[in-house]
From Swiss-Prot:
It comes from the Eukaryota. One of its GO terms (biological process) is maturation of SSU-rRNA. Belongs to the snRNP Sm proteins family. SmF/LSm6 subfamily. It comes from Neurospora crassa (strain ATCC 24698 / 74-OR23-1A / CBS 708.71 / DSM 1257 / FGSC 987). One of its GO terms (molecular function) is RNA binding. SMART domains: Sm. Component of LSm protein complexes, which are involved in RNA processing and may function in a chaperone-like manner, facilitating the efficient association of RNA processing factors with their substrates. Component of the cytoplasmic LSM1-LSM7 complex, which is thought to be involved in mRNA degradation by activating the decapping step in the 5'-to-3' mRNA decay pathway. Component of the nuclear LSM2-LSM8 complex, which is involved in splicing of nuclear mRNAs. Gene3D superfamilies: 2.30.30.100. This is U6 snRNA-associated Sm-like protein LSm6. One of its GO terms (cellular component) is sno(s)RNA-containing ribonucleoprotein complex. Transmembrane segments: none annotated. Residues 13-82 form the Sm domain. Keywords: Cytoplasm, mRNA processing, mRNA splicing, Nucleus, Ribonucleoprotein, RNA-binding, rRNA processing, Spliceosome, tRNA processing.
Length: 82
């Protein structure tokens, strides 16, 4: 970043970040554009994700709610802490 500014996530190990946010609300966006919001329960080295209290959003509209949701890692575009 310019002028010596650093971003909050710069230099942070992604696996460390993910282990820190387990149990917290996250947003998971898939390559298809579908978004899941829920409580992160686990994530593995392949980015396979388990969520609880999950809501599914398609084009910004809530479509479904799930107790548990499992997302295969190769479908994940990003995970962000809420």
């Amino acid at each position: 970043m310019e002028n010596g500014a650093t971003s909050q996530s710069e230099g942070k190990d992604p696996s460390g970040f993910l282990s820190e946010i387990i149990g917290n609300p996250v947003t998971v966006k898939l390559n298809s554009g579908v978004v899941y919001k829920g409580e992160l329960q686990s994530v593995d080295g392949y980015m396979n994700i388990a969520l609880e209290k999950t809501e599914e959003f398609i084009n910004g509209v809530k479509r479904r709610s799930y107790g548990d949701a499992f997302v295969r890692g190769n479908n994940v575009m990003y995970i962000s802490a809420d």
